[in-house]
Structure formats: structure tokens, C-alpha cells
Regions:
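A conserved structural/catalytic subdomain of Rossmann-like adenosyl-cofactor enzymes
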Residues: 5, 285, 291-518
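Conserved S-adenosyl-L-methionine
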Residues: 193-299, 304-306, 311-315, 320-325, ...
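A structure-centric signal for secondary-structure junctions around beta-strands
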Residues: 34, 175, 218, 245, ...
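Non-catalytic, mostly N-terminal accessory regions of nucleic-acid modification and defense proteins
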Residues: 1-206, 210-211, 215, 273-282, ...
Length: 518
């Protein structure tokens, strides 16, 4: 079986388990249990691997909790960020799950213990609340303790049965891949709400490559609307670890999604000291403002959401929004996210942000913000994508690429609306499509019906309209008509009609002649 076949089989198993164990509970409402169990297994195996340190004579899961000294525990927490006693490991709990009448209470105690092990250590903020959504007392699991334990046991046994290989034999990516697959499927089945926390991997790949283009190294990468962390992790997947020197940063407003993002970091083997995901409203309660600016920013913020805007008189003086001289409309926060990202961008940095297309041509405050961006030469490229690439919306969105190190004053426009492959319910970008977009992005050369670099003066003369269709002429797919050939065909047709009329007249005359003779 090839690696692709193995992965496909693993995905089939995971989704079958996710559907089997949830019973009559909606998959979206049950996701935290399956995802949480997978995470629990991962950190257990990860921790065991660390404690065994390659010594085959040590089997950490078989050790007695009592042999763990305070020094051993302290050293492990400083390195891994948390501590798990042998009895608390996933494999030991799952092995007895079916016969444990206190399973829900035991799981809750274990999760509390894992989180509390980080108290007072640098990892505390990264570990705190990780299992908050794995509510072992929820009625979603059943109405009685027995029902709850039965459902929890089914989840643990299902995840236990997944063939994720030997943790030490380079199978670590299987955990992260399995987690991303689950999140992707939950998002696809959740419709609009799913699109709010997960960016499809094929689009994430393009965004990450745009933000990281030409960089031999970046200090760190940031997503102000992190969701489940999928965009940040694409940067890790497609670039060597040493390129991103100080790690992965993000902020997320939804508590459940915030926990998913932190779990996602761990599951992709990013240690606690290499990521910092914060909870809160990016626009009104921003974190990381005191950090060094970011060399790479990626984001797929919510489209045209409402925000407090001008109702908060202090925001116009906020260093993120003040330079533009105007706030994004209260009913459409899109440009608030753009200005936030720009403020956090370093002098050598580049940001790639998914945007609702209306912000590129509407008037009012949005036009003034576009003027600020263009006049200060921050807009490198605007890319229009094909429709139906994202979960929960069929809208053809755009990607805005901002840069603080442009070498000319032109703005590049790329029409990628025809670059897609149709799949079951959504369109996708193939690797060939992404490569084609990146080639024209890098070269900045004009290609008919695909890309055009426009002078600053042209954009100004067009009232700072940044809509791709205003600059890249769409391909005319109408049939080209040869007028001379058409006239010749008409002449021939008319001649044939005239001859037919003569023939008909002759036949009619012959018939009438016959009737007269009678």
C-alpha cells in the first residue's frame, strides 16, 4: 500500500469513527470530543517518547507513578510545557475504558491535572484551558453517567484503533494530518460556520506562498484571525523550519476555535515556546502590539462583519487606524483587519489577506482607506479568485497582498477566476494553478487576460478603484464571426432559395396546366 493509499485509508477510518461514535448528536456539536481524544493520544505518545529518550529498555506507560520525582517532573515541564503521569496516558485510560464506571470523572481529573501541571511555568498560558471544550458531563454524551461513559469509551477506543504508526518512526505528521482532515470535514459539513474557522488547504498554500515569497528567513508569522491555525501551519508545511525563526503567532475571538488552534500547533509538533495563540477580539483588544513587527502575515478574516467602529471615539486615534484618517464602516470591518495587519507588518514584510470583493470598489470610507494604501505604496497585488473555493460561501473572493518594500509604484492585478478544478461541492486550486499564479506574481509581467501591472497615476485617475476587472480585460469567449464568409453563405443560401422558388413555381404551373386540360 502506498503512502497516499495509507493516508486515504486512515482518513476513511477517522471519518467513520467520527460518525459512529456521535450517535444522534450533530457532528458539528460532537467535534470537540473526537478532536480532543486525538489530541490526548498525541500528547500522551509525544510525552512518552520524550521520557523514554530512545532507550528501548524504558516503557514509560508501564512505570508506576510513584517513581516520578519532583526534579523529573520539573525538568519535563520546562521542556515539554506539561506533565503526564504514566497512569494518565491515553493508552492506559483507553485500555480500561469499557470497564471504567468512573471514566467521565477520571478523564476530567486527568485533563485538569495536565493543565495544572503548567501553572507557574512559561507554558502556562499555552496549556491553560486546552481541554475546556471536552466537557465530560455534557448531556450531548448522554443523559446518565452510564450513557456518558459508554459514549466516551467509544470515542477513546475508536481513536485508539487508528493506525498512526510508531511515534518514533517519523509518523508524527500523521497526527497533524489526521487532525487537519477532521477539521476540514467538520468545516465542510458545517456550511457557513465551518468557513469561519478553517481555510481550505489549497487556498492556504497559495496565501502562505504569497506572504513568504522571496524570503530566505522571517522572524515570525502572524494571523490576526487565526481560526483553527490552518493558515499558519501551511507556512510550516511548505517552508523549512529554520526559515521561520521565532515561531507562529495568532489571535482568535472564538473560545472553542482558539483551543482547536492551540491543539493544532501541538499536533504539528510545534513546541509551546514556538507558538503564541491568544484569545480575544483582534480589532478592539489586540495582542502583540508591543512585539517586534512581523515579517509575514497571513489571514482570512470574517467577511463584512459588524464592529464597533465610530461608536468608539478612541479608535480613530488608534495607531493602527489613525494614519488612514477614517475608520472602516461599522457594518463592514474588512478594512479594519487590513489596517491592523499593515500596522503589524515589518519593513521587510509582506501580508496576504483574503478580502470580500466589494471593499475594492465601494465609495465612502472604504475609498479613502484605499487612497491611503495606494498613496503610500503599500498595495503590491490584488488577485481575484474563482468562486466557490471556500466552505460556507460561493463568493469569488480576492487576495490583497500588502508590502512595505516595493521597488516601484505600480499595482499588480491578477485575474485567477478561471483557475480552478471542479470537485464534488467546491472548486479547488491545484498545485499547477498555484504555480501559475506565483509565477506571474513573481515576474510582475503582463499576460493578456491574466495579469496587468498598472501605474500609480492610472489607479488615481480611476478613483482608487482596485477591482481586478477594471484593469485586466476578460477573455472574450464568444465565437469569432467571419463577416465575408457569412455574407458568402448568405448569398449562396439566397440563391438556393430563389432556385427552389422557381422550381416550386414550375411544379405549380405544371399542376395547373394539367387541371385545365381536364
Amino acid at each position: 500500500m502506498t503512502s497516499l493509499q495509507q493516508r486515504a485509508e486512515l482518513h476513511r477510518q477517522i471519518w467513520a469513527i467520527a460518525n459512529d461514535v456521535r450517535g444522534s448528536v450533530d457532528g458539528w456539536d460532537f467535534k470537540q470530543y473526537v478532536l480532543g481524544a486525538l489530541f490526548y493520544r498525541f500528547i500522551s505518545e509525544n510525552f512518552s517518547s520524550y521520557m523514554e529518550a530512545g532507550d528501548e529498555s524504558i516503557h514509560y506507560a508501564a512505570l508506576d507513578d510513584s517513581i516520578i520525582t519532583n526534579d523529573i517532573k520539573d525538568d519535563a515541564i520546562r521542556t515539554k510545557g506539561y506533565f503526564i503521569y504514566p497512569s494518565q496516558l491515553f493508552c492506559n485510560v483507553a485500555a480500561k475504558a469499557n470497564s471504567n464506571d468512573r471514566l467521565n470523572a477520571d478523564l476530567n481529573s486527568i485533563f485538569v491535572a495536565i493543565e495544572s501541571s503548567a501553572y507557574g511555568y512559561p507554558s502556562e498560558a499555552d496549556i491553560k484551558g486546552l481541554f475546556a471544550d471536552f466537557d465530560t458531563t455534557s448531556n450531548r454524551l448522554g443523559n446518565t453517567v452510564k450513557d456518558k461513559n459508554s459514549r466516551l469509551a467509544a470515542v477513546l477506543k475508536g481513536v485508539e484503533g487508528l493506525n498512526l504508526g510508531n511515534f518514533n518512526e517519523h509518523q508524527i505528521d500523521l497526527f497533524g494530518d489526521a487532525y487537519e482532515f477532521l477539521i476540514s470535514n467538520y468545516a465542510a459539513n458545517a456550511g457557513k460556520s465551518g468557513g469561519e474557522f478553517f481555510t481550505p488547504q489549497h487556498v492556504s498554500k497559495l496565501i502562505a506562498q504569497l506572504a513568504m515569497h522571496g524570503q530566505t528567513h522571517v522572524n515570525k508569522i502572524y494571523d490576526p484571525a487565526a481560526g483553527s491555525g490552518s493558515l499558519l501551519l501551511q507556512a510550516k508545511k511548505h517552508f523549512d523550519n529554520h526559515i521561520i525563526e521565532e515561531g507562529f503567532y495568532g489571535q482568535e475571538i472564538n473560545h472553542t476555535t482558539f483551543n482547536l488552534a492551540r491543539m493544532n500547533m501541538f499536533l504539528h509538533n510545534i513546541n509551546y515556546d514556538k507558538f503564541d495563540i491568544r484569545l480575544g477580539n483582534t480589532l478592539t483588544e489586540p495582542h502583540f502590539g508591543d512585539e517586534k513587527p512581523f515579517d509575514a502575515i497571513v489571514s482570512n478574516p470574517p467577511y463584512s462583519v459588524k464592529w464597533i467602529g465610530s461608536d468608539d471615539p478612541t479608535l480613530i486615534n488608534d495607531e493602527r487606524f489613525a494614519p488612514a484618517g477614517v475608520l472602516a464602516p461599522k457594518s463592514k470591518a474588512d478594512f479594519a483587519f487590513v489596517l491592523h495587519a499593515l500596522n503589524y507588518l515589518s519593513a521587510k514584510g509582506r501580508a496576504a489577506i483574503v478580502c470580500f470583493p466589494g471593499i475594492f470598489y465601494r465609495g465612502g470610507a472604504e475609498q479613502k482607506i484605499r487612497q491611503y494604501l495606494v498613496d503610500n505604496n503599500y498595495v503590491e497585488t490584488v488577485i481575484s479568485l474563482a468562486p466557490n473555493l471556500f466552505f460556507g460561501t460561493t463568493i469569488a473572493v480576492n487576495i490583497l497582498v500588502l508590502s512595505k518594500h516595493k521597488t516601484d509604484t505600480k499595482v499588480q492585478f491578477i485575474d485567477a477566476s478561471e483557475l480552478f478544478k471542479k470537485e464534488t461541492n467546491n472548486n479547488i486550486l491545484t498545485d499547477a494553478h498555484i504555480e501559475q499564479i506565483m509565477q506571474v506574481f513573481a515576474s510582475k509581467e503582463d499576460v493578456a487576460h491574466l495579469t496587468k501591472s498598472v501605474t500609480f497615476e492610472t489607479v488615481v485617475a480611476n478613483d482608487y478603484n482596485l477591482s481586478v476587472s477594471s484593469y485586466v480585460e476578460a477573455k472574450d469567449n464568444r465565437e469569432i464571426i467571419d463577416i465575408a464568409e457569412l455574407n458568402a453563405e448568405l448569398k449562396t443560401t439566397v440563391s438556393k432559395i430563389d432556385q427552389l422558388r422557381k422550381d416550386i413555381d414550375a411544379i405549380v404551373a405544371e399542376i395547373e396546366g394539367c387541371e385545365v386540360q381536364k
